[in-house]
From Swiss-Prot:
Its cofactor is Zn(2+). Pfam families: Ribosomal_S14. Binds 16S rRNA, required for the assembly of 30S particles and may also be responsible for determining the conformation of the 16S rRNA at the A site. PROSITE patterns: RIBOSOMAL_S14. GO terms for biological process: translation. It comes from the Bacteria. Binds 1 zinc ion per subunit. This is Small ribosomal subunit protein uS14. Zn(2+) binds at C25, C28, C41, C44. InterPro entries: Ribosomal_uS14, Ribosomal_uS14_bact, Ribosomal_uS14_CS, Ribosomal_uS14_sf.
């Protein structure tokens, strides 16, 4: 819980240099694997897509 609190604080505070700003998943706080188009990490994206919570997204099959 303390880690999540620190993540929330880091969202509010702007860094000294803009290149230090790292996009994080708002659901789990993960800094890596962020999908900018959907605004979440790949893991949360996959879970929501499989549950059908993201409109227009479905599992690929060919």
């Amino acid at each position: 819980m303390a880690r999540k609190c620190l993540l929330v604080k880091s969202f509010i505070k702007k860094p000294k240099y803009s290149t230090r700003n790292k996009s994080r998943c708002p659901l789990c706080g993960r800094p890596r694997g962020y999908i900018r188009q959907f605004g979440m990490c790949r893991i949360c994206f996959r879970e929501k897509a499989l549950r059908g919570e993201i409109p227009g997204v479905r599992k690929a099959s060919w």
